Amino acid sequence: MEVEEAAYRTVWSEPPKRPAGRTKFRETRHPVYRGVRRRGGRPGAAGRWVCEVRVPGARGSRLWLGTFATAEAAARAHDAAALALRGRAACLNFADSAWRMPPVPASAALAGARGVRDAVAVAVEAFQRQSAAPSSPAETFADDGDEEEDNKDVLPVAAAEVFDAGAFELDDGFRFGGMDAGSYYASLAQGLLVEPPAAGAWWEDGELAGSDMPLWSY
């Protein structure tokens, strides 16, 4: 950001404005912002602000950019147009306009005064909307959400690596009750061939009185 600030001239680094020749301009011109003057109302009273910018290579020609509710908005409009028309040679009202203001497309400059004016209005509106937008809870906890997403990706992989490494591998004697695998599965097969006990053999006296559900239900 410091590089961008040093690359552009600003009204704060330039010599003070020369006194305006016409009385009207002396009364309405903004004391600091370049290309901005008040429209309507008495000096010192609230009013709207207009903006115009000098056209490079056309002596005495100015490009009218429109009327704005605040002097700051008009000053931002001046910066957007100056960047489009003059590039690095532009003198800005705000040093951060070089990177905070949406750029005016080159096609707008080629379209003439109307194209530049329309593009500047869009840029100022986008800048004001972005500056006024409050930070939402989703943005406040965005980092926490990202961390959770990272954990979702990392933890299963780590667990898979542990199991793949055989850290929980058991020997056959522990898994099959002291028998080898063949004898263990053979005993299971024999158990499936045994007839279930007679109905009522597994009733608990007194505890399941009145219940029709046999314990041997499979």
UniProtKB/Swiss-Prot annotation:
One of its GO terms (cellular component) is nucleus. Keywords: Activator, DNA-binding, Nucleus, Stress response, Transcription, Transcription regulation. Residues 1-26, 131-151 are annotated as: Disordered. GO terms for molecular function: DNA binding; DNA-binding transcription factor activity. Residues 141-151 have a biased composition (Acidic residues). The keyword Nucleus applies. Pfam families: AP2. It comes from the Eukaryota. Transcriptional activator that binds specifically to the DNA sequence 5'-[AG]CCGAC-3'. Binding to the C-repeat/DRE element mediates high salinity- and dehydration-inducible transcription. Confers resistance to high salt, cold and drought stress. This is Dehydration-responsive element-binding protein 1B. The gene is DREB1B.
